Amino acid sequence: MNIGRGDQRRTILLVDSDPHCRAALRLALEGAGFSVGEAANDEEGERTALRVKPDAILAELLMDTPHGRGTVSERLKADGSIIPCYIVSTASEALMGSVGLHELGISGVFLKPIDTAIVIQTLKGRLGMGDSGA
């Protein structure tokens, strides 16, 4: 895991049950100058987020959550977290109209297949990073 702030890189936490999706996003994000942490499920994602304090989280939407505890973003928001959390999903645009994303603590949605250039541009804009660093 490439997590840390010694080089002042912004840290992104990937929470996705698909190791191939995590690997593809990791390569793109690290290539753009981000540090990347990974978690395979929401519970692990919550623990990792509390430990490493990422600058943003990309989390799979349709993931089993233990005991109906809600998504990682909902649980972190309930604990007072202000970490921007983006959903990664195969769901259609209908989802976005039917769910109050901000009420769930969601900053935005990226649809699979992921366009990594859009993800990187969005994260850099949200985190105040210029294009000059990557």
Please describe what each predicted stretch is.
Residues 1-19, 77-78, 111, 115-134:
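Non-catalytic signal-transmission and effector/linker regions of two-component phosphorelay proteins
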Residues 17, 87-93, 113:
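Conserved active-site segment of CheY-like receiver
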Residues 19-37, 104:
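Two-component/phosphorelay signaling modules centered on CheY-like receiver
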Residues 38-47, 68-69:
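Helix N-cap/capping motif at the beta->alpha junctions
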Residues 50-52, 75-83, 104:
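Conserved phosphotransfer cores of two-component systems
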Residues 52-63:
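Active-site beta3 strand of CheY-like receiver
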Residues 67-71, 78, 91-109, 117, ...:
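Alpha4 helix (beta4-alpha4-beta5 surface) of REC/receiver domains from two-component response regulators
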